[in-house]
């Protein structure tokens, strides 16, 4: 099943998000910058956006190129590798833990289990370009690397060229044990008292306020709405995952 059908909790395409409340919205961010998607006391997830600037609309067309997941003292990278020409048989998903590449056999159901972090695993859900990353009791992230098709680029003026097929990530998220104060572009929708301020009746509801979600880097936890506490997370994390 495509991850974009695993609602709620997705970020797909020019990124549209489906929150925990079931509402879908766009958050465009800015190309070559990182934004916090989920920020909680013991978990922080940033997305780095890639894209092209569209002169007619005056904004960037953006997609999620990589995720930076911080928990305890660990940094997990899940990214899409750039390709001039898309080959569905070639793997474009890159996963690394604390800077060390995760090596997965090129076969469906191939599985890697971390020796450093108890409960952390990566499983291929296809021979290439699709993985599920799970930290038991905390999160499951399903990531597919996908290109922009010639047809999509023509219809939406995305600006795909022969030098770049705009490979990006479509992502589905499942979380366990988030606190009531969780924040971030997607994370806020998991609050028990969350009330959407989006114009849901609009054809393309857009979440603004990019500045408060902007992070200084893929693994930075310094966005204005950050709830992550590194020391508390590192101290408490050993009880469930390391």
Task: List each language-model region with its residue ranges.
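Von Willebrand factor type D
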Residues: 2-242
């Amino acid at each position: 099943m495509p991850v974009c059908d695993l609602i709620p909790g997705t970020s797909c395409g020019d990124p549209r998000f489906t929150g925990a409340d079931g509402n879908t919205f766009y958050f465009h961010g800015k190309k070559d910058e990182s934004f916090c998607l989920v920020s909680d006391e013991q978990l922080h997830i940033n997305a780095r956006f890639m894209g092209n600037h569209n002169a007619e609309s005056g904004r960037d067309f953006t997609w999620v190129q990589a995720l930076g997941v911080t928990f305890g003292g660990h940094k997990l990278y899940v990214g899409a590798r750039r390709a001039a020409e898309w080959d569905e048989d070639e793997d474009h998903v890159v996963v690394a833990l604390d800077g060390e590449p995760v090596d997965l056999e090129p076969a469906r159901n191939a599985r890697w289990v971390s020796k450093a972090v108890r409960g952390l695993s990566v499983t291929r859900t296809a021979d290439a370009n699709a993985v599920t990353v799970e930290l038991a009791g905390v999160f499951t992230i399903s990531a597919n690397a996908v290109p922009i098709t010639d047809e999509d680029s023509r219809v939406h003026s995305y600006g795909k060229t022969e030098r770049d097929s705009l490979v990006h990530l479509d992502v589905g998220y499942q979380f366990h044990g988030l606190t009531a104060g969780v924040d971030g572009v997607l994370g806020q929708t998991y609050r028990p008292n969350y009330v959407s301020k989006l114009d849901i009746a609009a054809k393309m509801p857009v979440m603004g306020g990019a500045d408060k979600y902007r992070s200084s880097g893929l693994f930075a936890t310094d966005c204005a709405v950050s709830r992550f506490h590194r020391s508390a997370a590192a101290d408490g994390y050993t009880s469930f995952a390391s």
